[in-house]
Amino acid sequence: LIAVHYADPHRENFQTGRAKALHDANIDYDVFATSFYSFWHGSPENLTNVLKTIAETYHKKVMVAEVSYCTTLEDGDGAANVVNASTSPLNYSIDPLGEGLAAAVRDSIAAVSAVGEAGIGTFYWEPAWVPVGNYAGAEESQKAAILASNIDKWEKYGSGWASMWSGPEGGGYDPGVSEDRSTHGSQWDNQAMFDFNGKALPAINVYKWVYTGAEGPVQVSSVDTAAYTMNYKD
């Protein structure tokens, strides 16, 4: 199957406009794919509406080509993460077992399924992009050494969006690769389906659970803090 892949399903008429342009230009393809990150791309309901419109109007299969969610706001390898405490909205729970991650994946699957037979599935991106060396789990006194070790490995082997050899600094082809090394490490390690030591999270079973269902123990995953101001004179 030939697929085209776009982002931003939340933008009004953006993807439907792209689908129309492809149709008008007689572009031959089979699958219209989209990214769907809940912190950027709107609601699952809107996603269903957009994909259903494209599927029914242009008789294409549709899918989610990228979905993910974070299990922590910590930086696993010393390369600043794309999704962090300033990202909004983070509308699922953030927990080390991946409950919020599993819910985000489940909702994306449900959104595609609601399209009907034209909805063919989802891909998770990127489930195995774990740190080279665990920067977050190190003692404060060890972090500088671990980061230096990570940088050496990133530059030699590549780990992030690109290694230095693909950019101007290394005589490569991509001017978008930064010399400050901000593209070299994993900026997605807090959204992997594995912890910072490479151990699979329970949430990796979500692709089985959407068919079988699952029950988990009732437990406290987070506690909201509240602040009150009182005027004792009144």
Segments from the language model and where they lie:
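Short, internal active-site loops enriched in acidic
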Residues: A7-E12, P127-P131
